[in-house]
């Protein structure tokens, strides 16, 4: 029952635009790691090409300069452990040298919100 309540709360957090990025991040980072990874795997699969470029760039650098278990784990650590960038100069340099190649996208915030809702419910 607690898991159902938690997922319902997260769907509400992402659906209501009144919550700040920090509040959403705090809710996400308080999830057990297994649910964070599951949610991120789904979001990566359903993300835009630009989203995938960012994920690939973060994963490449995190994999070279930190201990990660895949793309979702790299993103989870980048979002929930921001101090990793403050304490690892090689990671920062890698991100500066290998920025993601972003292109114009017709994808809207509503498309992203639908992906988040889908992954929170079906993830």
Curated annotation (Swiss-Prot):
Keywords, comma-separated and alphabetical: Disulfide bond, Secreted, Signal
GO cellular component, one term: extracellular region
Post-translational modification: Contains 3 disulfide bonds.
Residues making up the signal peptide according to the UniProt record: 1-18
Tissue specificity statement from the Swiss-Prot or TrEMBL entry: Expressed by the venom gland.
Subcellular location: Secreted
Name assigned to this protein: Venom protein 29
Species whose genome carries this gene: Lychas mucronatus (Chinese swimming scorpion)
